[in-house]
Amino acid sequence: YKDLASDNLIVGKDAYLLYAKATQIFKELNQDPLEEGISELAEISSSAKISSSATISSFCKISDNADIGQEVQIGSGVVIGESTIIGDKTVIHSNVSIYHSVSIGQECIIHAGSVVGSDGLGFVREGQDWEKIEHLGKVIIGNNVEIGSNCSIDRGSVGNTCLDDQVKLDNNVHLAHNVQLGRSSVIAANTAIAGSTTIGKN
């Protein structure tokens, strides 16, 4: 291959995979990291557990008994609900809302504007009115999961909504209550998945 180019080459059997790995290197070299530490403009509960290596930007709210792991990066305007767990090295971009009792694994990425842990659609007819079915379950997200911008993930009604390791969601994806996504599932943009749907791995 040396005769095909006068400059450096990356040579391998899987060119697309090598391209992906190269983009990761260039991103690290070129992106502006968040300002390290905890902003004085963040609102953090005294009962929250925050790693000393975490970054929490301005106008965030970290609620009671939340647990923020090592090297977590949280952008501005993020809300973390009560008793929610954020695993090590996870990145949460600006204006994400994560409700109470959500568990997010390590090295995940959640892009701007997404909502995790809201109630699903659950009502029972009573005469001319609707009686709300409270959602008592959780959202449990594995490791290395990426969630695009403006996604909404409902908590379980009684059981849990679960995303296994390596799941990837494009922008504007909706997961209704009790959805189960198997390892390495990929969901394209503008997809809505109905409640209690199970999708297998890969």
Where do the model's predicted regions map?
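Structural signal for interior beta-strand "rungs" in well-ordered beta-sheet cores
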Residues: 37-202
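Short, basic phosphate-binding NTP loop
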Residues: 1-46
